[in-house]
Regions:
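N-terminal positioning helix adjacent to the helix-turn-helix/winged-helix DNA-binding module
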Residues: 122, 145, 149-152, 174
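Phosphate-/nucleic-acid-contacting segments
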Residues: 152, 156-217
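A generic structural signal for short hydrophobic patches within well-formed alpha-helices
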Residues: 39, 110-111, 216
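Short helix-to-loop capping/linker segments positioned immediately adjacent to catalytic or ligand/cofactor-binding
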Residues: 91-92, 111-117, 136-145, 163-166
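Cyclic-nucleotide recognition modules
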Residues: 26, 69-128
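Cyclic nucleotide-binding regulatory domains
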Residues: 32, 37-98
């Protein structure tokens, strides 16, 4: 856990001794969740979390049970920071995308820890994390702005290719999660992926995609 926390953006620039003190003041608790396990739900008290292993999805679920995936949280990354800083209940649900170990911190502890060594740096780190997450959410809005399933897939996969520095990309979603993220029907999306492969746009196996150099067809 210490290796993950030492590299986590939330604790960047905070010496180990100060980090240990902050964790105590914030009521740190390590919990394990099975795949599809609920880490927290919409309306729960605010919680600040760091993924230690596995991965989580941040979701919006309406009263009819329709789910939209807003983000994927990988090891070392943070979730719940906006609600913890605002002192508001969770406005989203967070679910384990696979077996995951998570460090949970009390949201209200952010204010209670004021004056604790490293607290000011922690808040600065949270500001940077929030800004970067807003950029990620903005990119999702670009992907879902496309009117066709193909357009949404191309927008998302192109963005991943840029982020990963090559035409071979590994995405953090399975098919259902990708469909939920892009706001499309899974069966229709799978059919469109098959058509895109037939058209020579890409090849894929599970969550690994290779984008061809030309996007014709």
């Amino acid at each position: 856990m210490e290796k993950i926390l030492a590299k986590a953006p939330l604790f960047q620039g905070i010496p180990e001794g100060e980090r240990v003190g902050l964790l105590e003041r914030l009521g740190a608790e390590v919990r394990w969740f099975p795949k599809a396990g609920a880490v927290c739900r919409n309306g729960d008290p605010a919680v600040l979390g760091v993924v230690l292993s596995g991965g989580l999805t941040v979701e919006n679920v309406d009263v009819w049970g329709n789910k939209t995936i807003l983000d994927h949280i990988a090891p070392g990354q943070v979730f719940g920071e906006a609600f913890a800083c605002a002192g508001e209940p969770m406005g989203v649900s967070v679910t384990a995308a696979e077996e995951s170990e998570v460090l949970l911190l009390r949201g209200e502890g952010l204010l209670e820890a004021r004056g604790c060594p490293g607290h000011e740096r922690l808040l600065r780190n949270l500001l940077v994390i929030s800004a970067r997450k807003n950029l990620r959410l903005s990119r999702r809005s670009f992907h879902t702005a496309a009117k066709t399933i193909r357009g949404r897939l191309l927008s998302y996969l192109s963005d991943q290719a840029v982020a990963q520095g090559g035409r071979e990309v590994v995405i953090p979603f399975d098919r259902q999660q990708l469909a939920d993220y892009l706001g499309v029907d899974r069966s229709a999306m799978s059919h469109e992926l098959s058509r895109m492969r037939e058209d020579g746009l890409l090849t894929y196996r599970k969550n690994r995609f290779v984008l061809n150099e030309t996007l014709e067809g």
